[in-house]
């Protein structure tokens, strides 16, 4: 169930084909599986089981009690009977020929008469075909006189007695015989034509009976006239002529005082039986023959008129003539009927499935599907957003420039909306290609340009260069990139308040200052590399002198080393020692003081006991995984007396155990 026509008078499609062509079973099953979890299809359900035919449906009617729906269709020719109380198919029955139209003679489906395309009338009961009778010429419509129990069959061609009139066959169902036909003027036929007449033979196209009122019969002809017969006098009482085209549809109002007729040119007229001039004239807009006319009444006692051709269903206000609402199915329509005392409309159409429309403003849902009212209220409360993904909005001047203005009101490819129309995207592309043959080359060049621009935008772009504080810009950009926030550095560059920070050298950050180095101790300054090395070396030398005052035994330091777990030594290739960079740059005449480990020269063992020697050898033979400080080389470079003020060394709390040793090499 979906909203077909949004607006002041909404129309809901309860059942009907989703495509204009019948799909094969395997493709239909695949679409059902793929649309199972589609949010738009959550309200879809099957109202009546097997409410369809193999190819198309011809006619559909509802019984007077509202419990049965009978429909005819093809192929193979057959008719279906649905039970509305069970919402399912009761039975189906095949016939010998295709059905033209049918009538329900009883309040339920038990008695029905069917007009077939092979000039036969079939009477069906629940047990089967009760009787079949053949009529002299092809019939166009059926009507039933309940007072006299007669079936009226308007036919094609002229009578056989040479009077030059068309005939309406009368079959008395009580006596089971044909009565004298009523003669209707349908014009002249070509001389020498057969019994059925020529191709252009006149015909009585349609019949209507004013039931429950005066019972006057009206017959529409192919020459644009309407003749009225009184069944009591069995004679013609009036003629209504001068209509454009053939009369294809007739319908009496409930009070029997007005008559609506439709022509083959799509014109609709409403007449008062007391006045030959029409009360209302309307145009269906499609230029197609009118198939059905139905008088309707809303719950507020407003009188409406339904008109239908094979393309669209329109409902008019009978008093003002304004369009109330409309429905445009995807397939061609063959017949339209209204479920009495409700807002539901059923159609027989060329599609496989028959349509079922529900108009809440026209009336409540039938009692056999009363749940539709609650479903409609739920759908109205939901927020709907209608999208036109496959449509292009064009104004009327734009339609004229594309030579599409002749399609206005003639196809569903143009949907009126506000001051323009929604045009189907495929039609729009074809029209543009016809009006401008070079549009494809222009579109191709445009897409290539967009692709190149997209590739350029995806490249990694460097940070904008500035005159001053370039490192500050890079640092801020890197920090913002890690946090995943917008680029604040770019905003700072564009902000005039911070303009001088990146342009004026007076705002340059001095990275060699003491404050900067205290706040950024890990920042490497290329220009002050040599000074930093010298500071470190002199600091190490002074610390060695201060620590040389104390003395301690090496044995006291061994327990701390033994607590560390030994690791497997990694064999490293021997490298040739290269002089340091600052050593290579020194002149040869400068004084250089070097300190080397005392273990390289060997110690005196003369006054040492043998046990202590063995113990020392054992300790020396242990594998030490830590850094061997005794093998380091320190180089001291004398400096001038004028020294730069050194920043105070950062004091960190001691976490290791206090040692009495003053060995400077141990602290390296």
Swiss-Prot record:
Matches recorded under Pfam families: Beta-prop_NOL10_N, NOL10_2nd, NUC153
Biased composition, class Acidic residues, residue ranges: 542-556
UniProt entry keywords in alphabetical sequence: Nucleus, Repeat, Ribosome biogenesis, rRNA processing, WD repeat
GO biological process: maturation of SSU-rRNA from tricistronic rRNA transcript (SSU-rRNA, 5.8S rRNA, LSU-rRNA)
UniProt xrefs under Gene3D superfamilies: YVTN repeat-like/Quinoprotein amine dehydrogenase (2.130.10.10)
Composition bias type Basic and acidic residues, residue spans: 557-602, 610-620
Region entry Disordered, spans: 518-668
Disulfide bridge positions per record: none
GO cellular component, one term: nucleolus
Compartments (UniProt record): Nucleus, Nucleolus
WD repeats: 199-239, 242-281, 288-326, 328-367, 409-450
Subunit structure: Component of the 90S pre-ribosomes.
Family according to the record: Belongs to the WD repeat NOL10/ENP2 family.
PANTHER family recorded: NUCLEOLAR PROTEIN 10
Role of this protein: May be involved in rRNA-processing and ribosome biosynthesis.
Protein name: Ribosome biogenesis protein ENP2
């Amino acid at each position: 169930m979906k909203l077909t026509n949004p607006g002041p008078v909404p129309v809901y499609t309860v059942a009907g084909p989703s495509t204009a062509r019948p799909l094969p079973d395997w493709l239909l099953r695949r679409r059902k599986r793929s649309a199972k979890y589609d949010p738009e299809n959550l309200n879809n359900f099957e109202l009546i089981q097997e409410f369809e035919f193999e190819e198309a449906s011809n006619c559909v009617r509802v019984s007077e009690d509202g419990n049965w729906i009978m429909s005819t269709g093809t192929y193979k020719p057959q008719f279906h009977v649905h039970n509305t109380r069970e919402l399912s198919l009761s039975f189906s029955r095949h016939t010998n020929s295709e059905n033209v139209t049918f009538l329900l003679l009883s309040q339920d489906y038990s008695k029905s008469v069917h007009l077939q395309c092979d000039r036969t009338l079939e009477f069906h009961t629940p047990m089967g075909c009760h009787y079949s009778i053949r009529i002299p010429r092809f019939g166009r419509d059926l009507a039933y006189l309940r007072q006299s129990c007669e079936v009226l069959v308007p036919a094609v061609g002229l009578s056989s007695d040479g009077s030059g009139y068309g005939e309406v066959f009368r079959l008395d169902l009580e006596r089971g015989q044909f009565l004298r036909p009523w003669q209707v003027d349908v014009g002249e036929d070509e001389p020498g034509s057969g019994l059925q007449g020529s191709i252009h033979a006149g015909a009585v196209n349609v019949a209507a009976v004013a039931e429950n009122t005066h019972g006057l019969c009206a017959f529409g002809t192919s020459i644009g006239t309407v003749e009225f017969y009184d069944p009591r006098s069995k004679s013609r009482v009036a003629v209504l002529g001068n209509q454009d085209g053939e009369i294809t549809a007739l319908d009496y109002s409930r009070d029997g005082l007005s008559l609506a007729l439709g022509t083959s040119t799509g014109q609709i007229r409403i007449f008062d039986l007391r006045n030959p001039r029409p009360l209302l004239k309307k145009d269906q807009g499609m230029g197609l023959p009118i198939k059905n006319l139905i008088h309707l009444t809303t719950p507020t006692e407003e009188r409406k008129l339904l008109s239908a051709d094979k393309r669209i269903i329109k409902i008019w206000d009978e008093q003002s003539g304004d369009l109330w609402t409309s429905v445009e199915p995807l397939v061609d329509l063959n017949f339209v009927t209204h479920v009495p005392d409700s807002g539901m409309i059923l159609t027989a159409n060329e599609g496989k499935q028959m349509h079922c429309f529900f108009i809440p403003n026209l009336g409540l849902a039938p009692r056999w599907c009363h749940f539709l009212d609650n479903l409609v209220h739920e759908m109205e409360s939901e927020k709907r957003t209608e999208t036109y993904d496959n449509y292009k909005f064009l104004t009327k001047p734009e339609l004229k420039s594309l030579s599409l203005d002749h399609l206005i009101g003639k196809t569903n490819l143009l949907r009126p909306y506000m001051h323009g129309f929604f045009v189907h995207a495929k039609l729009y592309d074809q029209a543009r290609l016809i009006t401008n043959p070079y549009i494809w080359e222009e579109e191709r060049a445009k897409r290539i340009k967009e692709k190149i621009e997209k590739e350029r935008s995806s490249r990694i772009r460097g940070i904008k260069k500035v005159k001053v504080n370039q490192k500050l810009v890079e640092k801020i950009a890197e920090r913002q990139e890690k946090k995943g926030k917008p680029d604040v550095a770019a905003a700072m560059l564009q902000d005039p308040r911070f303009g001088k920070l990146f342009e004026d050298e007076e705002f340059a950050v001095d990275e060699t200052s003491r404050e900067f180095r205290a706040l950024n101790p890990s920042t490497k300054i290329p220009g002050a590399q040599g000074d930093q090395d010298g500071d470190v070396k002199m600091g190490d030398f002074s610390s060695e002198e201060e620590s040389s005052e104390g003395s301690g035994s090496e044995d006291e330091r061994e327990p701390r080393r033994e607590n560390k777990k030994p690791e497997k030594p990694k064999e490293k290739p021997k490298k040739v020692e290269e002089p340091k960079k600052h050593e290579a740059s020194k002149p040869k005449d400068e004084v250089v003081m070097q300190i080397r480990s005392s273990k390289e020269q060997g110690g005196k063992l003369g006054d040492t006991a043998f046990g202590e020697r063995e113990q020392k050898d054992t300790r020396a033979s242990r594998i030490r995984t830590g850094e061997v400080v005794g093998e380091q080389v320190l180089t001291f470079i004398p400096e001038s007396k004028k020294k730069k003020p050194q920043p105070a060394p950062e004091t960190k709390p001691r976490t290791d155990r206090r040692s009495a040793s003053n060995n400077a090499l141990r602290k390296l």
